[in-house]
């Protein structure tokens, strides 16, 4: 993290809202420049340099975990000259242009305000991607070639110019300050406000901003990105689990573009049974990390155990593998269902990791209601004709209208339609 206390203090004093972006940049400028210099020294590269560039990610650092609520920007520092420097440095043109097109899209969405805000809006970047994939006769983003990715960058920047009236920023520090202020702004986005209201998190806490040197999971077949949990967040079972994707980055794991693979062999076999995939096809096309990257898996498994023992709670972790080397991006106490909350607290107590008082404090009264939700009869579930499968956002079983947009759900609920 480049800075946290200064950023949090700025928000606590409401200076960001009252003084505006320019004043905030002035207040934080010296601290950020010094911290960037320190990261440059550690990474032996230079921010904005053409020959030996440092790329960074910019993400939130709120004191309370708010998974998925705040905005993140990856690959910051790229422009038309820097991307050529990355190619010269790595010898991997596809990786460089793939990172560039991801950056322009993410920056356009988060910083330049081009992300759709309602169901009527069309995402200009996704529309362009689908158009290019269709013209090239491919289905997946990772099937696009270097020339296709170059075309995407060109069309993305044209879309930015058309929608904002300005050229896409090329100065690394201009990009950085835009991203920092966008993360501050995301503290007050609608989903973050609603999440804080549900979780009882005060608005005045604010968020810090973390700027980290990039590591890349999209450098080829020896690279990957993933998320994992030291215990099952749904049931509380003491079972290491998670998902990963080879040659991918950031939100690819949860974006639904490609089918993620399981971290453990047991998890992969469980997934295959639920998905109706034979063992031969699973092993050939969807191997677990334990099978495909055994040495990385052993290191990851050892580290997740070490982290849980240190924090004495179930951990939610994000990681990247860059050309065979494992990097941890973050760890936090994982969110869990009511049933998992009780089981994890009791298991940690029995395992001697926490005492009775701590176990009781881990049980949130408002989540006990989840234990009373109706559930499917297991025997009936086995006989059910399943139309599709997915990851549940809440516990229990439900019947009713399928709703694809949050606005529709709120509107229909107000009209007593659901």
Residue ranges of predicted features:
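Single conserved hydrophobic/aromatic residue that forms the stacking wall/gate
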Residues: 1-7, 11
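Generic beta-strand/beta-sheet core signal
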Residues: 5, 59, 211-214, 225, ...
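Terminal amphipathic helices with adjacent charged low-complexity linkers/tails
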Residues: 12-13, 119-150, 313-381
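Extended, highly charged
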Residues: 12-235, 247, 260, 270-271, ...
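Phosphate-binding core of ATP-grasp and ATP-grasp-like enzymes
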Residues: 238, 245-250, 300-315
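Protease-associated
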Residues: 353-418
């Amino acid at each position: 993290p480049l800075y946290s206390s200064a950023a949090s203090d700025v928000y606590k004093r409401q200076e960001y809202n009252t003084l505006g972006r320019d004043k905030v940049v002035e207040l934080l400028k010296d601290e950020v420049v010094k911290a960037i210099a320190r990261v440059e020294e550690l990474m032996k590269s230079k921010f904005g340099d053409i020959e030996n560039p440092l790329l960074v990610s910019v993400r939130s650092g709120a004191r309370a975990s708010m998974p998925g609520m705040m905005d993140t920007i990856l690959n910051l520092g790229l422009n038309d000259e820097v991307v050529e420097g990355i190619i010269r440095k790595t010898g991997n043109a596809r990786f460089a242009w793939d990172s560039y097109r991801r950056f322009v899209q993410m920056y356009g969405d988060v910083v330049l305000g081009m992300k759709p805000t309602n169901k009527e809006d069309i995402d200009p970047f996704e529309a362009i991607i689908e158009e290019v994939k269709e013209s090239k006769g491919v289905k997946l983003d990772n099937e696009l070639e270097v020339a296709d990715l170059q075309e995407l960058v060109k069309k993305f920047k044209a879309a930015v110019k058309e929608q904002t009236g300005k050229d896409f920023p090329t100065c690394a520090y201009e990009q950085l300050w835009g991203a920092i202020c966008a993360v501050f702004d995301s503290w007050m986005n609608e989903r973050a406000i609603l999440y804080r209201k549900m979780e009882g998190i005060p608005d005045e806490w604010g968020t810090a901003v973390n700027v980290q040197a990039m590591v890349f999971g999209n450098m080829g077949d020896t690279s990957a990105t993933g998320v994992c949990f030291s215990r099952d967040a749904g049931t509380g079972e003491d079972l290491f689990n998670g998902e990963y994707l080879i040659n991918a980055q950031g939100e690819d794991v949860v974006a639904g573009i490609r089918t993620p693979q399981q971290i453990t062999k047991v998890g992969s076999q469980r997934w295959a049974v639920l998905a109706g995939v034979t063992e031969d096809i699973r092993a050939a096309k969807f191997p677990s990390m334990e099978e495909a990257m055994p040495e990385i898996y052993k290191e990851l498994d050892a580290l997740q155990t070490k982290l849980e023992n240190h924090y004495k709670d179930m951990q939610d972790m994000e990681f990247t593998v860059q050309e065979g080397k494992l990097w941890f991006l973050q760890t936090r106490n994982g969110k869990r269902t009511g049933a998992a909350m009780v089981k994890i607290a009791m298991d940690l107590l029995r395992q001697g990791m926490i005492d009775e008082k701590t176990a009781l404090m881990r049980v949130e009264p408002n989540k006990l209601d989840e234990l009373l939700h109706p559930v499917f009869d297991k025997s009936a579930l086995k006989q059910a004709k399943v139309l599709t499968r997915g990851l549940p956002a809440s516990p229990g079983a439900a019947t009713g209208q399928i709703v694809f947009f949050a606005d529709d759900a709120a509107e229909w609920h107000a009209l007593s339609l659901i």
